[in-house]
Amino acid sequence: MEVAAKLKYARISAQKARLVADQVRGLGAEQAVNLLRFSNKKAAALMKKVLNSAIANAEHNEGADIDELKVSTVMVDEGPSARRFHARARGRANQILKRTCHITVKVSDSQVEND
């Protein structure tokens, strides 16, 4: 059984969010939550929110045991960029990209599924 949770249009660049995603991929659910709780990165707070949602989905929808869950997949995809302009000298303007990303976290129980 694999359960997913998504956060779309998160206001952080995908490059920065992937640094945190690489740390929690493959860990147990409780261990991943503890790691994210003490991280001082902005992406860690967003990732913790999505991970807690995935754990709650597994518990409520599938009746899964929290102690058996592990983080099976963490994907961080680029979202659309908002464009802002910064005024420069002589009437010129530079473009500023406010990047977004989509964070997907999947948790699964430790047991191997037989099809």
From Swiss-Prot:
PROSITE patterns: RIBOSOMAL_L22. The gene is rplV. The keyword Nucleotide-binding does not apply. Keywords: Ribonucleoprotein, Ribosomal protein, RNA-binding, rRNA-binding. It comes from Coxiella burnetii (strain CbuK_Q154). This protein binds specifically to 23S rRNA; its binding is stimulated by other ribosomal proteins, e.g. L4, L17, and L20. It is important during the early stages of 50S assembly. It makes multiple contacts with different domains of the 23S rRNA in the assembled 50S subunit and ribosome. The globular domain of the protein is located near the polypeptide exit tunnel on the outside of the subunit, while an extended beta-hairpin is found that lines the wall of the exit tunnel in the center of the 70S ribosome. Belongs to the universal ribosomal protein uL22 family. GO terms for molecular function: rRNA binding; structural constituent of ribosome. GO terms for biological process: translation. This is Large ribosomal subunit protein uL22. Part of the 50S ribosomal subunit. GO terms for cellular component: cytosolic large ribosomal subunit. SUPFAM superfamilies: Ribosomal protein L22.
